[in-house]
């Protein structure tokens, strides 16, 4: 079964997707982490973001596993903390605004997924990466709640950050993503939208599992 979990940044979609992967015992592809990996190698190897061919020639390997996505550069595992910095996040957002890059990375995702069962989480998951998925969930939350979550996440990693700056960046990114002339950010037409602002992780997971069960039965997948 293919499950697409989409939504804006810091909405809680990654946490939910990891748990769903563990509960169903199927691999998890965190597409945002892959974006950050290419952003990281762009900075590390000093490759301009416009040089798409060079970026995709770099030694990056993506391995979806139960409850996590592992990425390797030159055969070595990448420290996830290095991928969570503000600098890498900014570069990832810049890459995401380039249509050719999105086309290439979406092609890479499709090659990784192929016909395997997988939880695919990230922007465009239900609209462009696996639009054929029988289960599509769009997880969202208020900008303020998302900024609070991202602030707490970065503080735990030891970064000195400002809540106001994070909120402003979230608002700017939402606007930029929704106004993209190509690949505008929006839920798939048949996605179930879940607002997590006032819900616990456990509540959201149960809601998603219920949707999976219902969609699976209707699609005669169980």
From Swiss-Prot:
Catalytic activity: CMP + ATP = CDP + ADP; dCMP + ATP = dCDP + ADP
InterPro entries, per the entry: Cytidylate_kin, Cytidylate_kinase_dom, P-loop_NTPase
Domain of life according to the entry: Bacteria
Binding site for ATP: 7-15
Full protein name: Cytidylate kinase
Encoding gene (name): cmk
Gene3D superfamilies, alphabetized: P-loop containing nucleotide triphosphate hydrolases (3.40.50.300)
Keywords attached to this entry: ATP-binding, Cytoplasm, Kinase, Nucleotide-binding, Transferase
Lineage summary: Bacteria, Pseudomonadati, Aquificota, Aquificia, Aquificales
GO terms under biological process: nucleobase-containing small molecule interconversion; pyrimidine nucleotide metabolic process
Family statement drawn from the similarity comment of this UniProt entry: Belongs to the cytidylate kinase family. Type 1 subfamily.
Subcellular localization(s) per the UniProt record: Cytoplasm
Class of this enzyme: transferase
Entry GO terms, CC: cytosol
Entry EC no(s): 2.7.4.25
């Amino acid at each position: 079964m293919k499950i697409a979990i989409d939504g804006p940044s810091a909405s809680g979609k990654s946490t939910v997707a990891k748990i769903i992967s563990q509960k169903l015992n199927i691999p998890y592809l965190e597409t945002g982490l892959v974006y950050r990996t290419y952003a990281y190698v762009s900075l590390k190897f000093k490759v301009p973001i416009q040089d798409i061919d060079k970026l995709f020639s770099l030694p990056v390997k993506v391995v979806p596993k139960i409850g996590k996505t592992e990425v390797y550069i030159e055969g070595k595992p990448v420290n996830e903390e290095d991928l969570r910095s503000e600098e890498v996040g900014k570069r990832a957002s810049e890459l995401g605004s380039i249509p050719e890059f999105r086309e290439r990375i979406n092609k890479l995702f499709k090659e990784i997924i192929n016909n395997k069962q997988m939880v695919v989480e990230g922007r465009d998951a239900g609209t462009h990466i696996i639009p054929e998925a029988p289960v599509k969930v769009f997880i969202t939350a208020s900008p303020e709640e998302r900024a609070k979550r991202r602030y707490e996440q970065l503080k735990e990693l030891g970064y000195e950050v400002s809540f106001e700056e994070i909120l402003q960046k979230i608002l700017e990114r939402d606007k930029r993503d929704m106004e993209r002339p190509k690949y505008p950010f929006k839920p798939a037409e048949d996605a179930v939208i879940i607002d997590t602002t006032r819900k616990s992780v456990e509540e959201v997971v149960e809601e998603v599992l219920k949707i999976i069960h219902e969609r699976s039965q209707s699609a005669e997948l169980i």
